[in-house]
UniProtKB/Swiss-Prot annotation:
The lineage of its organism: Bacteria, Pseudomonadati, Pseudomonadota, Gammaproteobacteria, Pseudomonadales. It comes from Pseudomonas aeruginosa (strain ATCC 15692 / DSM 22644 / CIP 104116 / JCM 14847 / LMG 12228 / 1C / PRS 101 / PAO1). Keywords: Disulfide bond, Periplasm, Signal, Transport. Putrescine-binding protein probably required for putrescine uptake into cells. Binds putrescine with high affinity (KD=3 nM), spermidine with relatively low affinity (KD=6.8 uM). Does not bind cadaverine or spermine. Putrescine binding induces large inter-domain conformational changes. The gene is spuD. One of its GO terms (molecular function) is putrescine binding. The keyword Disulfide bond applies. Disruption phenotype: No change in type 3 secretion system (T3SS) induction. This is Putrescine-binding periplasmic protein SpuD. Disulfide bonds join 173-236.
Amino acid sequence: MMKRFGKTLLALTLAGSVAGMAQAADNKVLHVYNWSDYIAPDTLEKFTKETGIKVVYDVYDSNEVLEAKLLAGKSGYDVVVPSNSFLAKQIKAGVYQKLDKSKLPNWKNLNKDLMHTLEVSDPGNEHAIPYMWGTIGIGYNPDKVKAAFGDNAPVDSWDLVFKPENIQKLKQCGVSFLDSPTEILPAALHYLGYKPDTDNPKELKAAEELFLKIRPYVTYFHSSKYISDLANGNICVAIGYSGDIYQAKSRAEEAKNKVTVKYNIPKEGAGSFFDMVAIPKDAENTEGALAFVNFLMKPEIMAEITDVVQFPNGNAAATPLVSEAIRNDPGIYPSEEVMKKLYTFPDLPAKTQRAMTRSWTKIKSGK
């Protein structure tokens, strides 16, 4: 979901490997495909040091890109990170291996309640483990929004971007949306009072029409560019992933560029997503992949990743190790009251997904 480490990162092989990893280390290269900027800077190096396995690490910024590679076959990857809303149909399509839990002793660290919830997409939790989760909400530059809007900008509401008279005021300072129809159109549906997983053509059309009304005031649709643009003050509002916006905030603070970034979960509610770790059916290094999955389930490793990417994780044993500032931030770890207003992204039927994609193409073109 971000771009800090570049398109491809080859983790250098370091000397040594631990006992019990000999079989995994027989195959010395592991190909991992993950969301951009979604791992700690030294995670891969630590894995290589422990196992002797090099990691070739590529990134993407949409589920659609990953799914196209998986369904085409021979993706070339050993580990991938699909969102839960795409997982069920990909499992049905037979693109993933079942996990050999006998080789995953760190499985015990996972959040049991979350694992139960995730069985809706993956019965028996046979194919994937939770990596990170988060929300899709409003990232904004309070100074630029105030300059454009005045003191009464509804920064805690979808009204900020879904009412034409509001978003029109923000055009001069820049507004971006995720380029993800299956995550953003449900936000419009929810705002209009419809179910986010509706397959009603009239309701889907209403969401499309809402976006066409605000389209002239949207600067761009992209699923990662907004991070640097928010951090640098190039845009003033981004509808994006919670952790990405917090990373933009951190980058601005590190740069000391006098840019302030904040994040709100809209009071009407918002979508929540779960990103999973899975092994493709055609993985060439299954043993190395299992070693990597087990490594990610180490509490100290997962806590370090959360501290960097600022998304909450699905590892119960890791939560106490996450920095207090992140654990106590309601934008990252929402309160129970806010959690009740969140919805999960549905596993949409192919017909509905195609309809959303057609609408999205129309919305982006503005026609």
